[in-house]
């Protein structure tokens, strides 16, 4: 029992560590200046949500092109959950994303977001495991995180992510659900981002249970 309790505390600690590293604004400007053709200036926000939103730790996540901040590339809500020897990060879609655009930068907009505004993206949770000073994550097994294409075809998402205290690195790739052929995604390697603002002080000061 003592071992079990200790393991539970360790799992919670890992989840809180991942959350504190995630919390922030990230920018690709360093890599844009090196090669703007393959690295447009992108900013990503992981803004902590109040404890009452999930009864634990959650984030509003928004990715924008720097030149067009009011038309995000994506908007999601994420929930951080200890899971065995890993950390599960559930993904939720916004029912009306336009209502919450800018919430990564504006706390008044963030305050308009409620659990009624979101719905779970089934099969799209990310599973993170710590490897030294890095958390390495990927989409949960099963190829069930489906992304429809404009031509009516369906793809599944494979996402590769690395998180440190100061960086976010990611590559998303879409594969045909029938042939498993690569349909979309970067051909020039993962996108790299540096943390330029730290929001970890906004994470609720209550342990995940």
Curated annotation (Swiss-Prot):
Organism: Trichodesmium erythraeum (strain IMS101)
EC class of the enzyme, as a word: lyase
Pfam family membership, one: CpeT
CDD domains: CpcT
Protein name as it appears in the record: Chromophore lyase CpcT/CpeT 1
HAMAP family: Chrphore_lyase_CpxT
Gene: cpcT1
Keyword terms of this UniProt record: Lyase
Record-level Gene Ontology MF annotations: lyase activity
Function: Covalently attaches a chromophore to Cys residue(s) of phycobiliproteins.
Enzyme Commission number: 4.-.-.-
Lineage: superkingdom: Bacteria
Family (UniProt): Belongs to the CpcT/CpeT biliprotein lyase family.
KW Cytoplasm (keyword) present: no
